[in-house]
Amino acid sequence: TCTDPNLLMGLSVSGSLSPEEYTADLTGEIHTDLEALKLVTEACSVSTGLSLSGYVSPMSESYRADIRLSDFSALLPTSRLQTNALSISAETDSTHINAAVRSGDMAMNFVSSIGFSSFLEKLNQSLPIIATVQEEKRLDMKALHQVLPPFEFHANAKRNNLIQQYLKGMNMGFSQIDLNIQNDTLLNTTGKIDRFSTGGITIDTLQLSLFERREKEERLYYSLQVGNKPGNLDQLASVILNGFLSGNTTKLFCVQKNRQGQEGFRIGCQADFLDSLIQVSFFPKNPIIGFETWTLNPD
């Protein structure tokens, strides 16, 4: 028990130890003001009930943890977060990883077909390859895919969750979000946001996709689609951005239409990173910019 007025804490701990396994259980309450404790310089206080259980078996590389927060409340510089219940669970052995987060109408799930040690090893192998993207301005998708660990991540949320509360403090929000990321034989990501709002502007639908395709040279394709219903941002009734990353080349093509189907933009560009130079070219020869047709110089 701690009775500091800025760190009120009462915890009960129990557990067991044996050569084969360890178990632990913890319950209690925590009420703390990190700003008053001078650990941070901005408003940050947390109050919650806590229940934690853990299991470790080193011989079988088996680990399990369940964390449950009740009557959780947090005051942050830009927002206040509150929920009756937040649960985090994870378990792994030498063959798999499972993890989940639940709170309100928010759900996140993560799975992998390899154990935690192998997962971390592959992540460490991928870091140098990711670093070379910045250093050499080149994406080696084949090499990256070979070292990325296999996994699946799924997340969805509506209006009653901590994400919404956090975004509200920044004058942002949405009605529903779905995100799926998978790395198996190929990397694939899809996402959709309904009624995304920021700064008084609302976009009815945002759809994102990111996927790997094996051709002459492995490419990472991306696509962003914006759609708005009649009466909302009619000049941006439809916006589609498509492109890919491959080696030292990236390509982007944009088509924007108004409610009447007129094209406000139809233009693409390709950027080639050559040592210390960036070579940029535009297409097609007669792009549409600002609802008018233009002619590009041959150079």
Report the location of each language-model feature.
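Hydrophobic lipid-interacting interfaces of membrane-associated proteins
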Residues: 1-22, 27-61, 66-121, 128-137, ...
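Surface-exposed, low-complexity/disordered segments
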Residues: 140-144
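A short, polar/charged loop/turn motif at coil->beta-strand junctions and beta-hairpin connectors
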Residues: 147-149
